[in-house]
Amino acid sequence: MLDNVLRIATRQSPLALWQAQYVKQRLEACHPGLTVELVPMVTRGDVILDTPLAKVGGKGLFVKELELAMLDGRADIAVHSMKDVPVEFPEGLGLVTICEREDPRDAFVSNQYKSLDEMPAGSIVGTSSLRRQCQIAARRPDLIIRSLRGNVGTRLSKLDNGDYDAIILAVAGLKRLQLDARITSPLAPEISLPAVGQGAVGIECRLDDTRTRELLAPLNHEETAVRVRAERAMNTRLEGGCQVPIGSYAELRDGELWLRALVGAPDGSRIVRGERRGAPEDARQLGISLAEELLNHGAREILADVYQGDGPA
């Protein structure tokens, strides 16, 4: 980084810019005299909007350009929605800070119906997520699920134009964009288990950049980091990309870590669920052991079908 200037690589969507501004304000508050600049970029994920993410490389499309900017020195850090962060990082880069988590639940958004269960048969629900799709299809196989891409504003416009009867979005994104009023009802984890890391903001940087890592340290929220560590360890063992039907949600209750997870067939015909409880310091192992349980109870076959025969070992 330059003397007293830190540069954040960010996508240009309203939500990405909110996250970058949030980190900028936190850093400048923690370190008077530090100037934080945004380096807005367009990623492939922002350009390819006419195809479901699962068919064009998953959500890693949203981070590759940001990582290149850090590797070639145009930026010092990148700010990500944790649910978009792939399992593996390019050599020399890593996730060093996880900020405090916002509400991780999914949101049911509709101008006509109060809840998913109230929708009549044949209603159209919009989502681009296989995870959401499989859980909705399992609960309401009589609904029609259609792909929905674009930023939050674009998705809401499609709902308002009548293209869909309801759409599913993340509560956290709507809250951050001050669109809380659009949330018809949050979906309990029992109905729609969130994505790995959903609601959390993560910061990636060059691992050898000691000064930047020191500046970022005060932004780390340990409880969130522990919860996300368990969720990501499970996802890593499942070899889950960001566009596979995997849900995972960890909570800390009375000093104990409670991790729930599922792997589902995209059409909702089969869902394998499991849970584990343990000590927070064992978060990573908890995630791995739960993944092993899921794999042994049918998740391996489901994922092999999703990956067209190339599932986890």
Swiss-Prot record:
CDD domains tied to this protein: PBP2_EcHMBS_like (cd13646)
GO biological process annotation, one example: protoporphyrinogen IX biosynthetic process
Keyword Metal-binding set for record: no
SUPFAM superfamilies named in the record: Periplasmic binding protein-like II, Porphobilinogen deaminase (hydroxymethylbilane synthase), C-terminal domain
Enzyme class: transferase
Pathway: Porphyrin-containing compound metabolism; protoporphyrin-IX biosynthesis; coproporphyrinogen-III from 5-aminolevulinate: step 2/4
Reactions the enzyme catalyzes: 4 porphobilinogen + H2O = hydroxymethylbilane + 4 NH4(+)
Gene Ontology cellular-component annotations: cytoplasm
The entry's keywords: Porphyrin biosynthesis, Transferase
Keyword Transferase: yes
Other notes: The porphobilinogen subunits are added to the dipyrromethane group.
Record family assignment: Belongs to the HMBS family.
UniProt protein name: Porphobilinogen deaminase
Species annotation: Cronobacter sakazakii (strain ATCC BAA-894) (Enterobacter sakazakii)
Name of the gene encoding the protein in the UniProt record: hemC
